[in-house]
Amino acid sequence: MTTWFPGHMKTTLKRLRDSVSKNDVIVEVRDARIPLSSRNPALETLAANRKRVVVYNKCDLAFPSAGDLCKTRALNSVRAFEETYVETLARWETIQTLRRYVGTVSNVPECIKRLLQLLQKLTYSDHAASNRTVKVFVVGMPNVGKSSVMNALRHASLHRRKVAVVGSHPGVTRNVGEVVRLFEGKNVYMVDTPGIMLPTILQPEDAIKFALVHAMKDGRLHNAVVVDYLLYRLNLIDPNTYTRLSSPTNDVSTFLHNAAVHTGKLGKGGTVNDDLIASYVLQLYRTGFFGAFVLDSMEEEQWQQRLALEKNLVRRNQRRVCSTRKKA
Ligand SMILES: Nc1nc2c(ncn2[C@@H]2O[C@H](COP(=O)(O)OP(=O)(O)OP(=O)(O)O)[C@@H](O)[C@H]2O)c(=O)[nH]1
């Protein structure tokens, strides 16, 4: 199955395993549009029995009422999200005790303030007891908004300018970043990290979702294939979501042709270039042009299926580690 796990991701995982200590806090940023598939089993072992906050970022692209970024409506949406999905999540999580869930839109200060308060609670207790340094590691898949969340936290806490580089394509942060102070007068620091993709894709549909939300670099899958999947999902929701581009259709070629003609995004000589227009449609999706919706099915059955796959993967990895040790 298609995945994207370049060397720097493997190195990051190893460096994190070596550097995260018992007192540190893990902030795992996931994409609210794929709350289930952006779980990364590779991070489960890293965060096991440590204080962890799971942040569902980009709620504005997942929940309709957060779309206009109006403060109260965005917050209500986050609350609704927690009440419905997070309950389901908590029921199925394997290590429940140490983690909390927060939904965010990285440029809505109220969402960030809630996260900041939670981090204050989690880090101050250790800091007060010993005055030792506490690190907050911001981890997650590529392009989920780790750097944006970090910048927003630092701005809300210290009114400081941006420290982490933000980019619209995945793989912008390539190294475990320098530590930056989070709270005035406290030895509490944040660490930005490169996005880590799942070493193994659990379900074929996940790869298409990662490409769609841009967690995976464009070009790993054909853009037209990804748009075909988007079209399928839009048709399930309501074909009126794309009337500005095309009349209702199940056929991706017709859709792309109509979209190219409607938008004037044509290739050389005024012909339709499927890849060009598909790439444009993907950009539109990523800005919320088709509305806000969650791509993962949150049915209990899906959760069970997913957890079974994750458990199998963990067992397979354990067996591999055992046999390597025996050989050595
Ligand atoms: N709509 C929306 N976009 C966001 C949000 N947070 C971040 N973004 C955008 O998502 C893109 C990626 O943000 P980054 O903060 O660079 O993501 P990252 O996880 O640090 O990325 P890598 O370094 O590639 O792993 C940027 O274009 C941001 O502007 C959000 O809450 N909503």
Swiss-Prot record:
Its main location: mitochondrion. Pfam families: MMR_HSR1 (PF01926). One of its GO terms (biological process) is mitochondrial translation. GTP binds at N57, K58, C59, D60, N143, V144, G145, K146, S147, S148, G195. PROSITE patterns: G_CP (PS51721). Gene3D superfamilies: 1.10.1580.10, P-loop containing nucleotide triphosphate hydrolases (3.40.50.300). One of its GO terms (molecular function) is GTPase activity. It is a peripheral membrane protein. It is found in: Mitochondrion inner membrane. One of its GO terms (cellular component) is mitochondrial inner membrane. Mitochondrial GTPase involved in assembly of the large ribosomal subunit. Plays a role in expression of the mitochondrial translational machinery. Belongs to the TRAFAC class YlqF/YawG GTPase family. MTG1 subfamily. This is Mitochondrial GTPase 1. It comes from Schizosaccharomyces japonicus (strain yFS275 / FY16936) (Fission yeast).
